[in-house]
Swiss-Prot record:
GO terms for molecular function: ATP binding; serine-tRNA ligase activity. It comes from Kosmotoga olearia (strain ATCC BAA-1733 / DSM 21960 / TBF 19.5.1). This is Serine--tRNA ligase. Its EC number is 6.1.1.11. It is found in: Cytoplasm. Pfam families: Seryl_tRNA_N, tRNA-synt_2b. One of its GO terms (biological process) is selenocysteine biosynthetic process. Homodimer. The tRNA molecule binds across the dimer.
Length: 424
């Protein structure tokens, strides 16, 4: 949630940011009207209170002089003013709630370093690592390789749960587990993250604090009548665990990692990536989250992104890092790097991680603060990134490490986890 003072003091900056994000600017005008009405109600209430205080003094003087008629008249007037003050107070409170609800729909303000653009076509490639493999045989897509090995089953998954689900078997099921353990070991042992095991069901307030609600409620799986939500990413509980808390300066930065399944309805992705495991309703992910001092958050973004990149480097998978433009930024992000892995089946790079600096956007929604060196309360900055999406990493290994006979070579770093050098 953005700071209402920024909206009030520099509305044209917000308007320009919304325009660059390709967001309807009318929501800003509605918010400014609500803010104006709220401040007018508060100002009028304050004047009425001052008038009531003046009348109270006059009542005391009238009683002292024995003028009971005047005192009674003034008391009636004071009573009427008290009713007006109460009504104005209730009006201001209602307008304040409307303003907060409106603010919940306004996205974060892009950082000045974010390239301006309308869509993914305007994203900027920052760097590349590795070279796509040149096959000397007819390579197969993972949706053919996996079923051919009897280790990837889309048909029975559809029978169980419908489209966009998969069953992994035998060595591919073990490969998924190996990837999870490898990623967690790397991040905890070498990158300094604290591992956390989290609930997969969270309350509405938790989803709202992290920017998932109210805007993206149709994307979430919801349980009735409990009004609980299956997490779309471990970012949600990792960030919201500190909701309504005050952290100490010496506790920053805090770096967390967690493995969880993630659940997404993908309501707006009809017709996209319909084959295989690229876009499914349930997928595994290792998440990275930082809580940092505001002065250090952009340096932290570079470090977090490097931590995610290291997974791909160790696995020997070609990738590139892309800076998202303003029109392609996620709702809560001020700046995002997408890490895209090379997939031969698409003959293209596909997203495997998004690493974002959210600045104080989530901290304001979730009231997450820290005490600075002067003992003043300030909002922390939060960052998040996938380190990595496990299913897409598995797909990248299957496709990039395939052999001419249809088997799959295991990346060297995973051999100790797998106990074999070849799958199939």
């Amino acid at each position: 949630m953005i700071d209402i003072r920024l909206v009030r003091e520099n509305p044209e900056k917000i308007r320009a940011a919304l325009k660059n994000r390709c967001v309807d600017e009318s929501i800003l005008d509605e918010l400014l009207e609500l803010d104006k009405a709220r401040r007018e109600a508060i100002s009028t209430s304050d004047r009425k209170k001052a008038e009531r205080n003046k009348i109270s003094s006059q009542i005391a003087k009238a009683k002292a002089s024995g003028d009971e008629a005047l005192a009674k008249e003034l008391m009636e007037k004071a009573k009427d003013i008290s009713v007006e003050v109460k009504e104005l107070s209730e009006k201001a409170k209602k307008l304040d709630e409307e303003m907060r609800n409106k603010l919940l729909y306004i996205p974060n303000i892009p950082h000045e370093s974010v390239p301006v653009g309308e869509s993914e076509e305007d994203n900027v490639v920052v760097r590349k690592w590795g070279e796509p493999r040149q096959f000397d045989f007819d390579s197969l897509a993972h949706w053919d390789l996996g079923p051919n090995l009897g280790m990837m089953d889309f048909e029975r998954a559809a029978k169980l749960s419908g489209s966009r689900f998969v069953i992994l078997r035998k060595e591919l099921a073990r490969l998924e587990r190996a990837l999870i353990n490898f990623m967690l070991d790397l991040h905890t042992r070498e990158h300094g993250y604290e591992e956390v095991a989290l609930p997969h069901l969270v309350k509405r307030e938790t989803m709202q604090a992290t920017g998932q609600l109210p805007k993206f409620e149709e994307e979430a799986y919801k349980t009735d009548p409990d009004d609980m939500f299956l997490i779309p990413t471990a970012e949600v509980p990792l960030v919201a665990q500190h909701r309504d808390e005050i952290l100490n300066l010496n506790e920053l930065p805090r770096k967390y990692t967690a493995y969880t399944p993630c659940y997404r309805r993908e309501a707006g992705s009809y017709g996209k990536d319909v084959k295989g495991m690229i876009r499914v309703h349930q997928f595994d992910k290792v998440e990275l989250v930082w809580f940092v001092h505001p002065d250090e958050s952009y340096e932290a973004l570079e470090k977090l992104t490097a931590d995610a990149e290291e997974v791909l480097k160790r696995l020997g998978l070609p990738y590139r890092v892309v800076a998202l433009c303003t029109g392609d930024l996620g709702f809560a992000a001020a700046k995002t790097y997408d890490i895209e892995v090379w997939l031969p089946s698409y003959n293209a790079y596909k997203e495997i991680s998004s690493c974002s600096n959210v600045e104080d956007f989530q901290a304001r929604r979730g009231n997450m603060r820290f005490r600075d060196k002067d003992n003043k309360l300030k909002y922390v900055h939060t960052l998040n990134g996938s380190g990595l999406a496990v299913g897409r990493t598995l797909v990248a290994i299957v496709e990039n490490y395939q052999l001419p006979d249809g088997r799959i070579r295991v990346p060297e770093v995973l051999v100790p986890y797998m106990g074999t050098e070849v799958i199939g």
